[in-house]
């Protein structure tokens, strides 16, 4: 009996010891759950946006509701953003003065975000002002991280002490380390090459993304291990992007060791499943707050492994209720915009300008093919009319696909709708400029539209005051086979090569057109000039901003809004369908292939003639040699 009791005691003692070791075994062998909530490319879309099918998506109040629901399920979740949090709605007009975007993100509990190219649209002066305004507000703010895109340092050209002071005042860092639920996270920001190309006036210096990212990962990991004795989860907020499963962020993940997750912004990509490369997950949730991305991982800090448990993109749509607190903040910010900005134009945020019963191109359709677009006809016609109303005789106006951010909805079209559609600008909200070009360069602009669009869809141009036709089978830079000025009275005029013509466009498109000669390596050029024919540099275009009769700059969005408001309540029926100002067709008819041929076609024809002549000469030589050889045998 005593032996039995001893055995039972021994077994009980063993069980007690085993149970006491279980927590240790779990801590050492089992992974810890990690949840990352993310967005990117929010573009100041505080309010819901219109779907192509008539529905709505996004809106920060709805987004906040879903964030709270996910945090209720995952209390230790972190919330991050991949940049381009600004520029895309009327709220951007308060960017320099009030920093509405960062303040709202702070209220929503964002842990960190990074800079995208559009954060530099107001140039360094606007960025400095915005950062200081954010701090002065006293509101909670997300940590800003960027590791490879900083201003020139003291002693370098372009050094700006105030810019550095604003960055330091906000507390912008290469990376940040945060702890949540016993897990440490390293979060750092990366700026991509294409993003840099899209921010040519930022005044910042781009360091190599790969080299900087690897150095940042190594330094931050060491700091975390030295200070906290543990391996961190490493998250890169990258404003570089992917395309077709590849792209800059794919190359970044492939080249840099140690990144667990890349939040990939800039390209407005939706990834239904993560891209996995070099043990790194690349994730994207679409633009404008369409979805909240949710990544659930199992992280073993001892083995330094991160395993994907689940990945979800939660739609932010009409089924989601508004969060009352964020909705109230947005309404307050709307009043801010009306008082500080819209009051100068005598309009209000939700003012209905016109009713629209026509379905216009979506932005994707604008980009998709070379074509005439009723939506873009409205925009270019509005530019021309606004500048003519300012007392300037205009021959033509143009807009580019790349500056059109949204379509106009069916039904009531508001001031906010118009601004959202034409919100892309350089430095401010996009002023119109009036410059002069020769007839030859005006034809070159038509060729840029016809020849470059298949290679770069954002370069498609849409004109007012010109009608032309494009044969897609003709030679590059000679695809336009017919072009005439379309005068206000409906008559047509020849475009004379040496004559100067007044052309109106937005500042952004004007700068891009001025760089055509450089980007085409001299093959084709468009030189903006003043009324006397003197060439203008890109920096001089600001001196040609159009002013209205009261001396105020004419904005792209306001030109469109005024044009619509003058339509007496309904969109003019002439915009129900295209009017033939751009005709695109394909023909191999020799007459149509050679009609109005220019130097590019003649050069190719000359090359073909020379090649044919060489072939003929070679064949003749071979035949003569054969005949001579045969004669010698006889």
Tell me what each language-model feature is.
Residues 1-12:
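Bacterial N-terminal signal peptides that target proteins for export
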Residues 11-20:
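Bacterial N-terminal signal peptides
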Residues 17, 110, 150, 164, ...:
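A residue-identity detector for tryptophan
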Residues 19-30:
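Sec-dependent signal peptide cleavage junction
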Residues 25, 243-250, 254, 327, ...:
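Short secondary-structure boundary segments
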Residues 28-319, 375-378, 382, 436, ...:
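Acidic, metal/ion-coordinating pockets
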Residues 30-35, 45-48, 53, 64-72, ...:
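Catalytic centers of hydrolytic enzymes
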């Amino acid at each position: 009996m005593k032996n039995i009791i001893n055995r039972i005691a021994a077994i009980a003692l063993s069980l007690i010891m085993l149970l006491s070791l279980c927590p240790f075994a779990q801590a050492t062998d089992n992974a810890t759950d990690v949840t990352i909530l993310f967005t990117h490319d929010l573009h100041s879309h505080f309010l819901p946006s219109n779907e192509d099918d008539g529905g709505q998506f996004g809106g920060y109040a709805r987004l906040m509701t879903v964030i709270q629901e996910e945090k209720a399920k995952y209390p230790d979740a972190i919330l991050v953003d991949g940049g381009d949090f600004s520029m895309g709605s009327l709220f951007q007009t308060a960017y320099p003065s009030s920093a509405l975007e960062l303040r709202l993100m702070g209220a929503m509990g964002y842990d960190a975000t990074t800079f995208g190219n559009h954060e530099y649209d107001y140039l360094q002066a606007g960025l400095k002002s915005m950062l200081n305004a954010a701090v002065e507000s006293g509101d909670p703010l997300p940590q800003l991280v960027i590791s490879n895109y900083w201003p020139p340092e003291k002693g370098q050209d372009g050094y700006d002490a105030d810019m550095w002071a604003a960055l330091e005042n906000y507390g912008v860092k290469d990376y940040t380390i945060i702890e949540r639920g016993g897990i440490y996270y390293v979060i750092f920001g990366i700026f991509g090459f294409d993003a840099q190309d899209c921010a040519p006036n930022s005044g910042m210096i781009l360091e190599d993304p790969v080299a900087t990212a690897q150095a940042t990962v190594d330094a931050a990991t060491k700091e975390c291990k030295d200070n906290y004795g543990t391996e961190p989860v490493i998250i890169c907020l990258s404003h570089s992007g992917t395309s077709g499963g590849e792209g800059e962020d794919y190359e970044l993940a492939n080249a840099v060791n140690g990144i667990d997750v890349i939040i990939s912004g800039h390209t407005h990509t939706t990834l239904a499943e993560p891209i996995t490369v070099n043990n790194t997950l690349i994730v994207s949730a679409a633009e404008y707050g369409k979805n909240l991305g949710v990544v659930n991982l199992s992280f073993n800090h001892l083995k330094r492994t991160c395993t994907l448990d689940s990945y979800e993109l939660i739609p932010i749509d009409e089924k989601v209720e508004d969060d009352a607190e964020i909705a109230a903040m947005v309404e307050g910010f709307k009043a801010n915009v009306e008082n500080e900005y819209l009051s100068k134009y005598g309009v209000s945020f939700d003012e209905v300008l016109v009713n629209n019963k026509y379905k216009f191109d979506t932005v994707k359709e604008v980009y998709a093919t070379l074509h005439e677009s009723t939506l873009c006809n409205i925009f270019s016609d509005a530019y021309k009319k606004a500048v003519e109303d300012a007392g300037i005789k205009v021959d033509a106006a143009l807009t580019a696909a790349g500056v059109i951010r949204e379509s106009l909805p069916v039904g009531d079209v508001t001031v906010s709708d118009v601004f959202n559609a034409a919100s892309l600008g350089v430095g401010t909200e996009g002023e119109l400029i009036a410059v002069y070009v020769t007839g030859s360069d005006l034809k070159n602009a038509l060729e840029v539209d016809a020849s470059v669009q298949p290679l770069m869809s954002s370069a498609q141009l849409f004109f007012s005051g010109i009608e032309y036709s494009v044969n897609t089978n003709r030679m590059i830079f000679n695809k336009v086979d017919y072009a005439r000025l379309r005068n206000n009275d409906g008559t047509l005029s020849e475009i004379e090569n040496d004559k100067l013509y007044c052309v109106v466009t937005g500042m952004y498109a004007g700068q891009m057109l001025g760089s055509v000669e450089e980007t085409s390596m001299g093959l084709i050029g468009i030189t903006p000039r003043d009324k006397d024919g003197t060439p203008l540099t890109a920096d001089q275009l600001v001196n040609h901003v159009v002013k209205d009769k009261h001396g105020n700059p004419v904005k792209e969005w306001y030109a469109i809004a005024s044009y619509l408001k003058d339509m007496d309540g309904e969109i003019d029926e002439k915009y129900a369908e295209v009017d033939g100002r751009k005709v695109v067709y394909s023909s191999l008819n020799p007459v149509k292939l050679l009609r109005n041929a220019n130097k590019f076609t003649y050069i190719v024809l000359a090359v073909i003639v020379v090649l044919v002549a060489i072939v003929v000469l070679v064949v003749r030589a071979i035949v003569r040699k054969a005949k001579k050889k045969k004669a010698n045998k006889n």
